[in-house]
Amino acid sequence: MALNGFLEFFQKGKTFRPKKPFASGTIRYSLHKQAQASLQSGINLRQVVRLPQGENLNDWLAVHVVDFFNRINLIYGTVSEFCNETTCPTMSGGSRYEYLWADGDLYKKPTALSAQKYIEHLMDWIETQINNEAVFPVSTDVPFPKNFIAISRKILTRLFRVFVHVYIHHFDRIVSIGAEAHVNACYKHFYYFVQEFDMISAKELEPLQEMTSRICKDKD
């Protein structure tokens, strides 16, 4: 399905935190609009994620990191009231996978947190990265940092863990509000993007491997 109904559907409900916009008139605003137009047209998602000819890879990555941050915030917002210290005492994906939080600041060592606390810290951390113009420069006159791809990989890897937790522990809520098709479409878009640019390791993708092979069948 096309993703054109995604934002309309989720913006009716609860947003976990404010959406991060792109500044009008910038290259990334134009790329964002181009990507949105492709999604709304229902084009094959494997083709949608490819770097447009002549465009800068870092700009393309930046646009998608912010977009996925916004979309996954919206998805988590629909289940956040059911995700608390009691229902989800650890940030996990079933019994086999548990994620520890470390940010080099408040949590210098990997620390077990509830899913709610982990995701709150994660979204704060990502927001800090996105708002830091030394990491996500607004002006084309300012170069991206040399480690921008590594930072993007870390952000996308951690956002994937939110998908893992939501799919394994809260998918009944997603189904109950009729959001299954929207969430699956967003996941497919995310998965094809991280595969196209090798942004997440195969080991990190393991928790949703079976589901991924079932729903991600778009041909090249």
Swiss-Prot record:
Q: What would be one Pfam family of this protein?
A: Mob1_phocein
Gene Ontology MF, one: protein kinase activator activity
Q: Which InterPro entries match?
A: MOB_kinase_act_fam, MOB_kinase_act_sf
Report the SMART domains cross-referenced here: Mob1_phocein
Q: Which Gene3D superfamilies match?
A: MOB kinase activator (1.20.140.30)
Source domain of life is Eukaryota
- Keywords in UniProt for this one? Metal-binding, Zinc
Provide the Gene Ontology terms for cellular component: cytoplasm; nucleus
GO terms (BP aspect):
signal transduction
Where along the chain is Zn(2+) bound?
C83, C88, H165, H170
What is stated as this protein's family in its record? Answer: Belongs to the MOB1/phocein family.
Q: What is this protein called?
A: MOB kinase activator-like 3
